């Protein structure tokens, strides 16, 4: 058995990223340690962690460069501040009692270290790698993260280097702005004026996709890179193919019509799950949504109770939302759509809605920002992590 730890600390070109393995010298970590020291690789030469020349840290630690070292400047950074930082972090942890009840002569540590080719500041390189090594080591010893922490954090996480956040819908209720538009100028205006908010979803409506194709998702993404974007394709056939097309276009969710054959719906849901996007069933003109959900072998992420624009003057009737959630096994978001106005938001939420789909009340407003804020005020939901102080993650 061996333990695994990881940590990223710092900023700019000098940031440090350490992947760490700790295990018995008699096991796979010990074998990998011996192979690393005895089988050198050009540009990725492993080096033992020493506090200073002739002073090996304990437990014995080998450092593996993650990035090919192409010039002497990078070599000096790896054999200088990185080597010293890793060794000192391990030695300090030993002094602090991190290895209590562990035979330090019986274990080995492998630390993979990242040095950006543009890194220059030795002081920052040292301090960031020291912190990252120490944090990675303690995470390994603590078996961090536990399952509860991982599940809690996974959908609110933003990768430090990726540059954008993949939104997930774990904190309802949400406001979905439906852009059933055919003018890209108007689309740009809406995207510019709708406030940035964790509880806003952007929908590329069916007319918009029919006119401009799925490429419109990419255009929306350019203006709102962190938005949760729905491709309202109302799939009726080739469910798996069209769901994959939506994912390839960078949509976060795809809509399949509840009037489609059951096999088409199931294929769309399965494909959406496979590629990591949400599946939505539009229940427009479906007489018994709960019954449809119940008979599906794979359940959708979201059900949209959608009254068509042509019939939205009729009374607000969203059906038995609790029955639909029960049919889906309890883990289902329900969206209500069609003529949603500010004065009926509370009724929809009380009925069990998780997502309020609003179109013309926002997109046709003379003050799009203010109109959106009115709906958001009704949701009574603060920004995710607004008051959270971020440290390690």
UniProtKB/Swiss-Prot annotation:
Region (Formaldehyde-activating enzyme), start-end ranges: 1-161
Entry keywords, A to Z: Carbohydrate metabolism, Lyase, Multifunctional enzyme
GO terms (BP aspect): 'de novo' pyrimidine nucleobase biosynthetic process; carbohydrate biosynthetic process; L-ascorbic acid catabolic process
EC number in record: 4.2.1.147, 4.1.2.43
InterPro entries tied to this protein: Aldolase_TIM, Fae/Hps, HCHO-activating_enzyme, HCHO-activating_enzyme_sf, HPS/KGPDC, OMPdeCOase_dom, Ribosomal_Su5_D2-typ_SF, RibuloseP-bd_barrel
3-hexulose-6-phosphate synthase: annotated segments: 162-393
Keyword ATP-binding attached: no
Active-site annotation: 17 (proton donor)
SUPFAM superfamilies, per database record: Ribosomal protein S5 domain 2-like (SSF54211), Ribulose-phoshate binding barrel (SSF51366)
Residues binding substrate, per UniProt: 19, 48, 66, 68, 83
Domain of life: Archaea
Reactions catalysed, as given in the entry: 5,6,7,8-tetrahydromethanopterin + formaldehyde = 5,10-methylenetetrahydromethanopterin + H2O; D-ribulose 5-phosphate + formaldehyde = D-arabino-hex-3-ulose 6-phosphate
Function per UniProt: Catalyzes the condensation of formaldehyde with tetrahydromethanopterin (H(4)MPT) to 5,10-methylenetetrahydromethanopterin. Catalyzes the reversible formation of ribulose-5-phosphate and formaldehyde from 3-hexulose-6-phosphate.
Protein family (similarity comment): In the N-terminal section; belongs to the formaldehyde-activating enzyme family.
Xref: HAMAP family: Fae_Hps
Protein name: Bifunctional enzyme Fae/Hps
Source organism: Methanoregula boonei (strain DSM 21154 / JCM 14090 / 6A8)
Gene (name only): fae-hps
């Amino acid at each position: 058995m061996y333990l695994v730890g990881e940590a990223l600390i710092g900023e700019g070109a000098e940031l440090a990223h350490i992947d760490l393995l700790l295990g018995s010298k008699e096991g796979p970590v010990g074998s990998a340690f011996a192979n690393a020291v005895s089988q050198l690789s050009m540009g990725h030469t492993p080096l033992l962690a020493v506090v200073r020349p002739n002073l090996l840290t304990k437990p014995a630690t080998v450092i593996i460069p993650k990035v090919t070292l192409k010039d002497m400047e990078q070599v000096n950074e790896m054999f200088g501040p990185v080597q010293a930082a890793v060794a000192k972090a391990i030695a300090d942890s030993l002094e602090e009692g991190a290895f209590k009840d562990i035979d330090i002569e019986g274990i080995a540590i492998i630390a993979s270290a990242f040095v950006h080719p543009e890194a220059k500041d030795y002081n920052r390189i040292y301090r960031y790698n020291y912190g990252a090594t120490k944090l990675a080591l303690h995470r390994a010893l603590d078996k961090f993260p536990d399952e509860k922490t991982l599940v809690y954090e996974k959908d609110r996480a933003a990768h430090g280097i990726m540059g954008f956040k993949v939104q997930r819908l774990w904190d309802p209720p949400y406001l979905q702005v439906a852009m059933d538009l055919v003018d890209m100028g108007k689309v740009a205006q809406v995207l510019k004026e709708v406030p940035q908010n964790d509880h806003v979803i952007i929908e590329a409506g069916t007319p918009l996709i029919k006119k401009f194709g799925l490429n419109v998702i990419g255009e929306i993404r350019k203006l709102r890179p962190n938005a949760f974007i729905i491709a309202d394709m109302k799939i009726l056939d080739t469910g798996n193919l069209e769901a994959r097309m939506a994912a390839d276009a960078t949509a976060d969710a795809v809509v399949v019509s509840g009037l489609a054959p059951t096999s088409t719906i199931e294929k769309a849901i399965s494909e959406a799950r496979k590629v990591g996007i949400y599946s939505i069933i539009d229940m427009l003109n479906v007489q018994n949504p709960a019954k449809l959900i119940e008979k599906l072998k794979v359940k959708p992420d979201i059900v949209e109770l959608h009254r068509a624009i042509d019939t939205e003057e009729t009374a607000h009737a969203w059906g038995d939302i609790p029955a639909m959630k029960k049919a889906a096994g309890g883990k289902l978001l329900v969206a209500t759509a069609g003529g949603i106005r500010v004065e009926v938001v509370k009724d929809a939420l009380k009925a069990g809605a998780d997502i309020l789909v609003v179109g013309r009340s926002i997109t046709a407003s003379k003050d799009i920002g203010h109109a959106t804020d009115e709906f958001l005020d009704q949701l009574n939901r603060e920004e995710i992590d607004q008051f959270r102080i971020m440290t390690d993650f």
